[in-house]
């Protein structure tokens, strides 16, 4: 019975039907009906499309320029739903098209008057970082390797240019660094 119930619990949690009580230091965790734990939460306040519009506005605020594939990759939602919400935001004038993607209209107006140069930089971005998760659909196929894990993706001067592969045990054990540098 445990083998049948345990896989279903996270799915019920994602649907806001149950809540996992996580006390610090406790191994046993209780599962309770979501409505009993949070009676003030109104799960019908927003339609699915309205909720997606809110998510996409927040995503655009943090990402500045993005496309539907990035939002789908990050939120793990059906492309049809993402595109529908994006089209609604375009129609409402919240988003605007720019450089093959979308951005908040307010960001577009700010960038018209911004003339700064991006700084030269190298960042080792953890695979669970927001920028990595939203570009996962590209990065996974761009830097293949035979090692157990991709530990970090390398963001060099604002572009994805490599990955560090290996295994994370007590500390990261880097076995290989794959680079795609311009000549």
Predicted region positions:
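Long, charged, low-complexity, helical-prone intrinsically disordered regions
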Residues: 1-183
